[in-house]
């Protein structure tokens, strides 16, 4: 059985970890980073860039550079949060045929799952390059407060990326695993995980206990806000810059897509700098232009000003924390440790708020960017059977129920119930001789069903004619370990049954997922072809370069016909390199190798004469073995090949 890798699929950054020799390791990507920006760019020639390369070109290609797509996962286009994002994002957010929020780039309409799959493919490839073997299984993390649709969407993204998602695990729970397994003591402890990431906020109260030599992680409660995170902090800075620039220059930058992308980069940079400095300068020359000429932006932003801009956002995290403490049935004084997760928790004002809420200093010995991926990898090693000393008991974040007479939400499974779990309840008909019932499944805490999230609906037909209230319809809610809901309705009189895995009345159909899997596979094949072409070009370039050099130095000792044959072969190879036919490049490379064989012999003879004998390891062959700097060219070629 291969490794089950752990992936933190973040709003702003993603991270991948593997467990080796019982120790988790965060894997560096091809660019050398331990985290990868969750940014995907669709460029003119059809290439898809992921991570740092996508971020680098975002200023010049804002409409086709997708970021923070996690905020759209499993959401309807009409959701208020999505509508708010439409006005802020430089790329197009559109309504799919089923009402879901999708994105559009280069005239391609794509589900958020498809875009997220590009990030997951990059994480998969990063792990494969490190392990030297194919990876097909993963544990992927989600915010604890993700609902059923969002969890299903994350699982679908994994499938599109070619991964069998063995488990969806909550981010705070994963961070608790990373923290708890690090502790060698046998002391039971209650911890609070405060997770303020790029797009979401979660808080979980978790008890870590030692039971018969096994570490048991039991989630007591969880709460959060799936539309609150570092991206919102950045937006407050962007809004402030726009207002200040309009005051000074009379120009509104909010309609300038290129300028907005530069502002986003500058805002993020300023926010990060102000975590350690008291003041920073935002300097953007030539940010825009009007009839009077180019305009430059130069503003000073202090930490105090930043804190006043985002104070309301920080305060919004207090409510979910207090609710989680209450739901866990503990006092604040009983919480032993507070763990910070997510890059936004590096902000001093956030740390001060955490101290104020929990009455103690948060711990600084957990890496907020990597703990979630590490925990996911640990859970992967548990699922693969490599680790047997860990038991994880997670919960469902929101109540689940069905709509009953009068539009009431009748709860079947209350929030913070340990999963997996199953619950059955018997209902009846509302009218005489009613032949069918519609089961509508909701998730949320409101008393009226319509105010909660409709997850899906289905019919149970063929109910035997009877007076209202007589038929017995047993509805069973079954939540698996991923937090995904399966519902069954059964007429106890006739034995008729209907069941569904909740996929919402939106979400991707099986056909759509299969099509997207095929698209992703086609992209992988295209990537392989592109890499092979680059490799062929590099090999050809190296040979052409060294042959030209050898021809300059030793061409005079060749017969005219030999020299002409080499020059003709060089010319043909140069032409082939300009094209995109790999076979032609390889054929012309081979032809040049044969044509320059005599030249190679002359070069070798000259080298031997110079050194007074055969060079160690010298071998007969083409001129590429003769050129003094051939090794340099080869090393360059290898570097390209490594990075793929």
UniProtKB/Swiss-Prot annotation:
Similarity-based family: Belongs to the heat shock protein 70 family.
InterPro entries: ATPase_NBD (IPR043129), Chaperone_DnaK (IPR012725), Heat_shock_70_CS (IPR018181), HSP70_C_sf (IPR029048), HSP70_peptide-bd_sf (IPR029047), Hsp_70_fam (IPR013126)
Name of the protein in question: Chaperone protein DnaK
Sorted UniProt keywords: ATP-binding, Chaperone, Nucleotide-binding, Phosphoprotein, Stress response
ATP-binding listed as a keyword: yes
Induction: By stress conditions e.g. heat shock.
UniProt biased composition (Low complexity): 612-630
Job of this protein: Acts as a chaperone.
NCBIfam families: PRK00290.1, PRK05183.1, prok_dnaK
Biased composition (Basic and acidic residues): 635-644
């Amino acid at each position: 059985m291969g490794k089950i890798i752990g992936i933190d699929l973040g709003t702003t950054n993603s991270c991948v970890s593997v467990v080796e020799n019982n120790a988790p390791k965060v894997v560096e990507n091809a660019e050398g980073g331990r985290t990868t920006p969750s940014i995907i760019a669709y460029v003119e020639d059809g290439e898809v860039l992921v991570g740092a390369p996508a971020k680098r070109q975002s200023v010049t290609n804002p409409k086709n550079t997708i970021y923070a797509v996690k905020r759209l996962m499993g959401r309807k286009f009409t959701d208020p949060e999505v509508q708010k994002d439409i006005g802020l994002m430089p790329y197009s957010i559109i309504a799919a045929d089923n009402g879901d929020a999708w994105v559009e780039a280069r005239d391609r309409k794509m589900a958020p799952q498809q875009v997220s799959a590009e990030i997951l493919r990059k994480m998969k490839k990063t792990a494969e390059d490190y392990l030297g073997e194919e990876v097909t299984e993963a544990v992927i993390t989600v915010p604890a407060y993700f609902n059923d649709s969002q969890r299903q969407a994350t699982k679908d993204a994994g499938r599109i990326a070619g991964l069998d998602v063995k488990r969806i695990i909550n981010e705070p729970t994963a961070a608790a695993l990373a923290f708890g397994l690090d502790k060698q003591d046998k002391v039971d402890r209650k911890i609070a995980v405060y997770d303020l990431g790029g797009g979401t906020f979660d808080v979980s109260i978790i008890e870590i206990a030692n039971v018969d030599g096994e570490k048991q992680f039991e989630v007591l409660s969880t709460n959060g806000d799936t539309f609150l995170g570092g991206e919102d902090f950045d937006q407050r800075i962007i809004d402030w810059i726009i207002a200040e620039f309009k005051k000074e220059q009379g120009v509104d930058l909010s309609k300038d897509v290129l300028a907005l992308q530069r502002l986003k980069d500058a805002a993020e940079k300023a926010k990060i700098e102000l975590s350690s400095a008291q003041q920073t300068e935002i300097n953007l020359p030539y940010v825009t232009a009007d009839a009077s000429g180019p305009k430059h932006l130069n503003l000073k932003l202090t930490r105090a000003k930043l804190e006043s801009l985002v104070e309301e956002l920080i305060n919004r995290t207090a409510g979910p924390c207090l609710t989680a403490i209450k739901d866990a049935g503990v006092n604040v004084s009983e919480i032993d440790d507070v763990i910070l997760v997510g890059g936004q928790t590096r902000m001093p004002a956030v740390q001060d708020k955490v101290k104020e809420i929990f009455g103690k200093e948060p711990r600084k010995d957990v890496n907020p960017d990597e703990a979630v991926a590490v925990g996911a990898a640990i859970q992967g090693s548990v699922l693969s059977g490599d680790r047997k000393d860990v038991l994880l008991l997670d919960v469902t974040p929101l109540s689940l129920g069905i709509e009953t007479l009068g539009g009431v939400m009748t709860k079947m499974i209350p929030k913070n119930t340990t999963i997996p779990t199953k619950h059955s309840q018997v209902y009846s008909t509302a009218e005489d001789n009613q032949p069918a019932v519609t089961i509508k499944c909701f998730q949320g805490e409101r008393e009226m069903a319509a105010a909660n999230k409709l997850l899906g609906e289905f019919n149970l037909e063929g109910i035997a004619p009877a007076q209202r209230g007589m038929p017995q319809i047993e509805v069973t809610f079954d939540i698996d370990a991923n937090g995904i809901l399966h519902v069954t309705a059964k007429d106890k009189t006739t034995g008729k049954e209907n069941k569904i895995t909740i996929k919402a009345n939106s979400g991707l159909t099986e056909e759509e997922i299969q099509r997207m899997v095929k698209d992703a596979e086609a992209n992988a094949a295209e990537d392989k072809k592109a890499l092979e072409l680059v490799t062929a070009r590099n090999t050809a370039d190296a040979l052409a370069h060294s042959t030209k050099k050898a021809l300059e130095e030793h061409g005079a000792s060749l017969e005219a016909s030999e020299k002409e044959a080499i020059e003709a072969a060089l010319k043909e190879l140069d032409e082939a390199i300009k094209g995109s036919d790999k076979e032609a490049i390889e054929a012309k490379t081979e032809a040049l190798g044969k044509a320059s064989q005599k030249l190679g012999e002359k070069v070798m003879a000259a080298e031997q004469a110079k050194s007074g004998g055969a060079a160690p390891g010298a071998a007969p062959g083409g001129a590429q073995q003769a050129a003094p700097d051939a090794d340099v060219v080869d090393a360059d070629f290898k570097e390209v090949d490594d990075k793929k």
